[in-house]
C-alpha cells in the first residue's frame, strides 16, 4: 500500500496520545496503508512499542517540538478530545502553525470510505460483539479491515488494514462521536443510562442512538437485541421510520418477530453450547462458543446476523464464532497459582459487572467448591456517584469483595465520593482497600485452593492480576521451602 491511497491530509500525521486503545488502532491502519506517522504519549506502553516497531516516530511526553519528528513536517494532527486538553502544547503549536487538527472519529470515517461498513455500538458489549464479527468474517476468508477498542485474542491487535471490501469497527457512544459514521450495518447491543457527565440526561444519551441509526447508508440494516428494553424501543422507533430492523434475543422474551432466537444455552466449562433458530429455517442450529456467559451468546447472535447481512455463509460464521477466544481484558485468564485462577475483566458499569459475575459464578460452580473473589475499582467519580448502590448490588454475586478507590481518568474528585461509596452497598463480606500497593498481598492471603479471583474495572486495576499471581506463588514458596509455586 502507498500513501497515495490515503487522503492527502492523512499521508503525514502526528497523533497526540498515540498509545491509547483507539488512537493506536488508527496509527496501525495509517502505517499499513503507507502513511508516515509520528506521535506522543504520556508514558511507554505495549501499544507504543508495537507502533515504533512498525515505523512510527514516538516521543514520550508532550512538547511543541514533537510536531517536527517527521522530516518535512505533517499535514495534520490527530487527537481525541475526551482525553487530551486543548492546552496541550502540541495542539497549541498546531494551531499556531495553521496545521489542521482532526478528531479520531473523523479520521476513522475517512479510512472507511469506499468499504462496506459494519459498526457496533451500545452501552455494553461493543468490543466483544465487534470482535466476534471480525473473527467470523476472517474465518470466511473476507479479511476485513477493523478497528476495535480491545485487543483480539486471535489476532493480538486492535486494528488491521485488510484486503477485503469490509470495514468492521466499534462506534463509541460516550461522547457522541458515533455520529461521524454512515454504516451499512449497525448493531446496537443495548441502551442503558451511562456517560451522564457528558450528556446531562438519560434522554439525551438515548437520543444519540436514534441519530446514529438515522445515519444508516441507503438500504442498510439495524441489528438490535430485543431482550434489552432500550434497544428494543430503538428498534420500534426505527421501524416506524422505514428502517430495516433485524432483531435477536431469547425465546419467549421478545414481543416482536426475531431474525435470530436463542432457544437454549448451556454452560460448559469456560465455554457454552447454544441452540439457535434463524428466521426462515425449519430446524434449529447449534452454536458453540469458547467464552462463558449467556450475555456472550446474545452478543454472538448479533454478530451472526451482522455477518450474514454482508453475505457471509451461516455455517462458516458459526464455525468462526466457535473459535472466538475473547478480547483482552474481557474475562481474560491472567494466570493460575496454588489452584487459584486469576482473571481480569473490563466491566465498569453495574450491568456489565452483574453479567460478568453471573458467567464467572457458573464457571466456579462447575469446577468445584471454590469461592469467587472480586477486586473492583470504580471508574469515574460521576459514574460512581450515579451507580454506587447498583454496583453494590451487582457485586453481591461474589463471595468476597475488595473495593479500591475510584480511578479518576479524566475527572476531578467529587466531595464525599470514593470506593467506600460502593463498599457500603455490598452485603457480602467486603473490604475497602485504599492502599493500591497492598492489594495483591491482601487478596492473595484471602484466596484458597479452587478459588477464582477477578480484577474488574476500566482503570489500572488490570495491573493487579499478575501481582496477585506472583503473591500466590510467593506464598507457596514460603509455605513449602524448596518447592516452586505453580505459575501458568
Swiss-Prot record:
Q: Which GO terms describe its biological process?
A: cell division; cell wall organization; peptidoglycan biosynthetic process; regulation of cell shape
Which locations, inside or outside the cell, does it occupy? Cytoplasm
Catalytic activity, EC: 6.3.2.8
List the PANTHER family: UDP-N-ACETYLMURAMATE--L-ALANINE LIGASE, UDP-N-ACETYLMURAMATE--L-ALANINE LIGASE-RELATED
State the taxonomy lineage: Bacteria, Bacillati, Actinomycetota, Actinomycetes, Mycobacteriales
Q: Name one GO cellular component term.
A: cytoplasm
Which pathway is this protein assigned to?
Answer: Cell wall biogenesis; peptidoglycan biosynthesis
Q: Which InterPro entries match?
A: Mur-like_cat_sf, Mur_ligase_C, Mur_ligase_C_dom_sf, Mur_ligase_cen, Mur_ligase_N, MurCDEF_pg_biosynth, UDP-N-AcMur_Ala_ligase_MurC
Q: Which gene encodes it?
A: murC
Coiled-coil spans are: none
Predominant localisation class: cytoplasm
One MF term in GO for this entry? Answer: ATP binding
NCBIfam families hit by this protein:
murC
* Family, similarity comment: Belongs to the MurCDEF family.
The organism sits in which domain of life?
Answer: Bacteria
- Record keywords, A-Z: ATP-binding, Cell cycle, Cell division, Cell shape, Cell wall biogenesis/degradation, Cytoplasm, Ligase, Nucleotide-binding, Peptidoglycan synthesis
Pfam families of this UniProt entry? Mur_ligase, Mur_ligase_C, Mur_ligase_M
Binding of ATP: at which residues? 122-128
Q: Tell me, in a sentence or two, what this protein's role is.
A: Cell wall formation.
Designated name of the protein: UDP-N-acetylmuramate--L-alanine ligase
**Reactions mediated catalytically:** UDP-N-acetyl-alpha-D-muramate + L-alanine + ATP = UDP-N-acetyl-alpha-D-muramoyl-L-alanine + ADP + phosphate + H(+)
